[in-house]
């Protein structure tokens, strides 16, 4: 039978009475997709009917209603405006082993939230430029054409003036912050911006993320409205405390690729630098001026495109480029950005040749070789080579060399000097046995049941299926279940991303 999400049972009046609280925390969970298996349905991208019924009921019964989104990506949040009395929403992501404790600390006020969205959350699914091209929606499960070109995520929403539900870089806090531009400088190819960040609140400590965006001039090459070039997170600031945050980016971060001559270039014009705390809450803080085109890198075409994909283009002048303007909309922002004198914004003239041009040469690929590798390669048959490339998958006795593993390369070539590589199914190590025992015959068995139904089996059967926990030869295979990439990036620490 097809897998069904465990949406949960109906919440009853009896549950409300037993809870003895005025606050309800309702968690919405979805698994990540793979192999084009996600569907645009109310049960996957949106609420299941039982979830909608439960949310409506709980919002009526409790004074405070918190919704936690335990999903690895975007989710349809239209219900926030359709169901009254929902007070707060937390994007949990998929945080791994300590995720529950982290959310509890946030809800209880032990820590102040400081994460920032790494994706733009649209009001409607069709607001995404590639919405109709995804998976089965265009009838093609085998090929995906990236027609968005450079207009991906916030670069699309900001350029095409599509109002998102939550913009890129957005995230609320229990306190309020103020950013004050302290200065901007240019040293060779490094642009440096200093920003004083102050916690204006009176109760909570908190952290803020300073974000730098640059609007590049349109020329022969079309540009997005703005691009993120740098970000930095403050320390935990106490109420009234202030910290100077220094951010840097390189002029090479402003280049664009020109396909016709395989060149990376800076086109002439004004590069407008912005500071803020999301892509929709920025102020102009400086201008970089370039008089003539600057080529920074030269490449060569080595792979001919098999077909030409018609990419999305923005034909009008970008409104966000006005040097004395800003990009601010009311997203319940908790950060005021102060520029003392908009009329005296610093400008810097970029000198020709400030970036040395680099020519890339693509010669024959260097292949590592030694007597040992030559001997191994000469011993391989055509079948051996095919098996080495394709891998052994999840079938055959070799799969059980690490019980519960997600796949192997191949264990059939160990006699020829090629070891078998056994893989876990992601950081969570799904199905992977933490402890296994090795018998005197070399057979490996997991010590603990990794499937729940096994605990109901008769003891003699379990004894045959499982390894001996008292064996002197035990193998340990632990996994961390660390947060998924979107959750790590949301922390906004550069050393994590």
Where are these regions (language model features)?
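C-terminal non-catalytic regions of proteins with extracellular/luminal or membrane-system context
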Residues: 1-417, 422-492, 496
């Amino acid at each position: 039978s097809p897998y069904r999400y465990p949406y949960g049972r109906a919440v009853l009046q009896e549950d409300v009475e037993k809870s003895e609280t005025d606050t309800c925390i309702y968690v919405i969970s979805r698994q990540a997709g793979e192999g084009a298996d996600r569907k645009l349905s109310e049960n996957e991208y949106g609420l299941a009917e039982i979830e909608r019924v439960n949310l409506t009921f709980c919002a009526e019964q409790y004074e405070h209603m918190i919704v936690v989104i335990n999903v690895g990506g975007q989710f349809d949040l239209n219900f926030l405006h359709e169901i009254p009395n929902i007070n707060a929403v937390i994007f949990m992501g998929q945080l791994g082993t300590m995720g529950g404790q982290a959310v509890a600390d946030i809800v209880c006020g032990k820590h102040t939230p400081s994460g920032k969205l790494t994706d733009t959350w649209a009001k409607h699914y069709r607001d995404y430029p590639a919405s109709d091209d995804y998976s089965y929606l265009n009838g093609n499960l085998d090929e995906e054409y990236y027609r968005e070109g450079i207009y991906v995520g916030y670069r699309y929403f900001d350029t095409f003036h599509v109002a998102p539900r939550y913009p890129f870089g957005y995230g609320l806090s229990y306190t309020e912050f103020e950013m004050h531009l302290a200065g901007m400088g240019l040293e060779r190819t490094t642009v440096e911006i200093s920003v004083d960040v102050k916690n204006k609140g009176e109760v909570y400590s908190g952290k803020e993320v300073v974000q730098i965006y640059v609007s590049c001039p349109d020329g022969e090459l079309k540009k997005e409205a703005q691009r993120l070039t740098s970000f930095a997170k403050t320390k935990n600031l106490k109420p009234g405390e202030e910290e100077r945050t220094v951010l840097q980016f390189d002029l090479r971060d402003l280049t664009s690729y020109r396909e016709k001559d395989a060149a990376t270039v800076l086109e002439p014009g004004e590069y407008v630098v912005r500071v803020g705390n999301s892509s929709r809450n920025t102020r102009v803080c400086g201008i970089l001026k370039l008089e003539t085109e600057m080529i920074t890198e030269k490449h060569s075409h080595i792979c001919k495109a098999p077909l030409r994909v018609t990419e999305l283009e923005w034909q009008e002048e970008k409104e966000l480029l006005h040097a004395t303007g800003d990009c601010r909309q009311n997203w319940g922002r908790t950060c005021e950005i102060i520029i003392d004198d908009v009329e005296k914004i610093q400008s810097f003239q970029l000198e020709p040749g400030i970036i040395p041009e680099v020519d890339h040469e693509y010669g024959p690929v260097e292949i590592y070789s030694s007597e040992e590798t030559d001997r191994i390669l000469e011993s391989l048959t055509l079948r051996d080579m095919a098996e080495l490339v394709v891998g052994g998958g999840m079938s055959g006795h070799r799969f059980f060399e690490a019980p519960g593993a997600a796949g192997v390369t191949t264990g059939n070539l160990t006699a020829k000097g090629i070891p078998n590589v056994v893989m876990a199914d992601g950081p969570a190590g799904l199905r992977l046995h933490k402890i296994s025992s090795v018998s005197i015959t070399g057979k490996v068995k997991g010590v603990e049941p990794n499937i729940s139904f096994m605990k109901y089996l008769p003891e003699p059967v379990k004894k045959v299926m499982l390894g001996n926990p008292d064996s002197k030869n035990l193998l340990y295979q632990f996994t961390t279940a660390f947060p998924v990439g979107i959750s790590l990036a949301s922390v906004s620490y550069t050393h994590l991303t």
